[in-house]
Amino acid sequence: MVERARPSLIWEGSLWQQGILRVAGVDEVGRGALAGPVVAAAVILPAQMDPKELEGVRDSKQLRPQQRAQWAERIRQVALAVGVGSASAAEIDRLNIRQATVLAMQRALAKLDPIEHILLDGLPLAELGSRQTALVKGDHISLSIAAASVVAKVWRDALMQSWDRQYPGYGWRTNAGYGTREHRLALQNLGPTPQHRRSFAPLAELKVSRYDG
């Protein structure tokens, strides 16, 4: 079996060597969910830190829930700064998912001022300014981006679990608002809640337009 590459500080280190010390890794979760916000986190790690301090951190999808929770706490202890931002279902419907994701990232980054450079998972986003480096599969190769993915995932999952008590029947405690079979059946039987994304195809196709819970 081929071992997956671990996120490292190679990209951060190259910037630190140039005197660029406040480097924020940014990532988001929840883009494809049918309910709940899209959430972004931004993490600034200390320059020249020992990567062994966060050696178990991976892209959040590669970790079990308990591991994510433990590492999210450790990340907050080690990091110079951590910011979380979100954009609601209503904002997603009004703006579209891309613009709402950018908004969530901007809100997360606003909590970290000053920032000298951004490391971003995926493609460049002009809205975040010129001082950025976009990395394909950045959450697999950059430790600060991977850390951001863990923080964002833990924050969003906790929110969806709290909403599961407020809106029972949709299985948000386990599906986090994603379109599982259980969730789609609940939509047909119960209708959408105020936390559902009405602009997403499965919701737009529903004839039921109100929540009766």
From Swiss-Prot:
Q: Which cofactor does it need?
A: Mn(2+); Mg(2+)
The annotation note on the cofactor reads: Manganese or magnesium. Binds 1 divalent metal ion per monomer in the absence of substrate. May bind a second metal ion after substrate binding.
Reply yes or no: does the keyword Nuclease apply: yes
> Which residues take part in binding a divalent metal cation?
27-28, 121
Q: What is its EC number?
A: 3.1.26.4
Which EC class does it fall in?
Answer: hydrolase
Reaction equations catalysed:
Endonucleolytic cleavage to 5'-phosphomonoester
Any one Gene Ontology biological process term?
A: DNA replication, removal of RNA primer
User: What are the residue boundaries of the RNase H type-2 domain, all occurrences included?
Assistant: 21-212
Location within or outside the cell: Cytoplasm
Q: Which GO terms describe its cellular component?
A: cytoplasm; ribonuclease H2 complex
- Pfam families, from UniProt? RNase_HII
The terms under GO molecular function for this entry are:
manganese ion binding; RNA binding; RNA-DNA hybrid ribonuclease activity
Q: Which UniProt keywords apply?
A: Cytoplasm, Endonuclease, Hydrolase, Manganese, Metal-binding, Nuclease
The record's function comment reads:
Endonuclease that specifically degrades the RNA of RNA-DNA hybrids.
Q: Which family does it belong to?
A: Belongs to the RNase HII family.
Q: What is this protein called?
A: Ribonuclease HII
Species this chain originates from: Synechococcus sp. (strain JA-2-3B'a(2-13)) (Cyanobacteria bacterium Yellowstone B-Prime)
